[in-house]
Regions:
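Extracellular low-complexity, O-glycosylation-prone Ser/Thr/Pro/Gly-rich "stalks"
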Residues: 17-34, 39, 45-57, 311-336
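Fungal secretory targeting signals
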Residues: 1-25
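Short loop/turn segments at secondary-structure transitions that flank enzyme active sites
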Residues: 44, 232, 307
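Active-site mouth of glycoside hydrolases
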Residues: 27-213, 298-299
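Extracellular glycoside hydrolase catalytic/binding regions
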Residues: 54, 58, 139-142, 146, ...
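Acidic carboxylate-rich catalytic motifs and surrounding loops in phosphoryl-/glycosyl-chemistry enzymes
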Residues: 272-273, 304-308
Length: 336
């Protein structure tokens, strides 16, 4: 989501955009998708105040709300900031407090049998600058993956929504992340990669992603997933509660679906949402129905987003009175 275009009133915060467990994965009850879940937002808030103060600049998910989504939903995408784990540089030591809070959240989720996806919500930036040091980026991921290498239900998401970057750099950063994670001993976990141009599904073939991202390699068979995001407003930014049409969800996935099939790749819709109105609800259901029909390539989807500081945000899935929680929860659960 292009959160730089949105202003949220979320408490006093400004918005930014492990222990081993038994392998008791929660799968969708009717086999529709491998993954169906929710983004958890808050640890990435307050990106202009680094490292920031917990409770003032950023917040961690309220763990008890995870139980509200189980057993229908089996994956939670935890949005963090790279700079809060390594303050001064990507190769710095991990901050013990932020890491401990991340582990607490991850372990709570995975001990419930669900997947916890860790994603640096950094848009391919570190401390405000586009990441170009591929080796340092790999070091960051090596250090982080080492902490979760024994937790089979962690999913690693290389970076949230690269944009306005040299395509070759985006590919190299993704590959460096994959290699670093595997090199750290995290060999059983899924990894999701993201493309340039906000990793949009609708622009996957026109952005350069289709021409270059397919060459990524992973030593672990069947564990690499291409994560795309898709919103249904006029510019796909997720900044409006208005959806273009009742069929826009399916339409914006069609070209990407063809690419996934033609290239023998697996896809995941890591962010999606729609406004609280009939047109959007029909569009969201149409999109999920289309993904269900093509679940040979589409592995699942995650709603954007839950989190304790969303207030009356139009897409809030925060229990129990979030706008989307009261209007979309049953719709999404029907695909579990």
């Amino acid at each position: 989501m292009r959160v730089s275009n949105i202003l949220f009133v979320a408490g006093s915060a400004s918005l930014a955009l492990a222990a081993p467990v038994r392998e008791n994965k929660r799968a969708a009850s009717n086999g529709t998708f491998t993954f169906l879940g929710i983004n958890e937002s808050g640890p990435e808030f307050g990106e202009t105040n680094l490292p920031g103060t917990l409770g003032t600049d950023y917040v961690w998910p309220t763990l008890s709300t995870i139980d509200t989504f189980l057993p229908k939903f089996n994956i939670f995408r935890i949005n963090i900031l790279m700079e809060r784990l390594t303050h001064d540089s990507m190769t710095a030591s991990l901050d013990a407090t932020y890491l401990a809070d991340l582990k607490k959240t991850v372990n709570y989720i995975t001990n419930k049998g669900a997947y916890a996806m860790i994603v640096p919500h950094n848009y391919g930036r570190f401390s405000g600058s586009v990441i170009s040091d591929v080796d340092a980026f790999g070091t960051w991921w090596s250090n982080v993956a080492t902490e979760f290498a024994n937790n089979t239900q962690v999913v690693f998401d290389i970076n949230n929504e690269f944009h306005d970057m040299d395509q070759d750099v985006v590919v190299k950063l993704n590959q460096a992340g994959i290699d670093a994670i595997r090199g750290a001993g995290a060999t059983s976990q899924y990894i999701t990669v993201e493309g340039n141009s906000w990793t949009g599904a609708w622009s996957w073939k026109t952005s350069g992603n289709a021409d270059s991202m397919g060459d990524l390699t992973d030593t672990q068979e069947g564990k690499l997933i291409y994560q795309m995001h898709q919103y249904l407003d006029s510019d796909s930014s997720g900044t409006s509660e208005t959806c273009v049409s009742t069929t826009i969800g399916q339409e914006r996935l069609e070209a990407a679906t063809t690419w996934l099939k033609n290239n023998n790749k697996k896809g995941l819709l890591g962010e999606f949402a729609g406004g609280n109105n009939d047109q959007c609800k029909t569009a969201v259901k149409g999109m999920l129905d289309y993904m269900k029909e093509n679940n040979d390539v589409w592995q699942g989807a995650l709603w954007w987003a839950a989190g304790p500081w969303w207030g009356d945000y139009m897409y809030s899935m925060e229990p129990t009175d979030g706008v989307a929680y009261t209007s979309y929860l049953d719709i999404l659960a029907s695909y579990a």
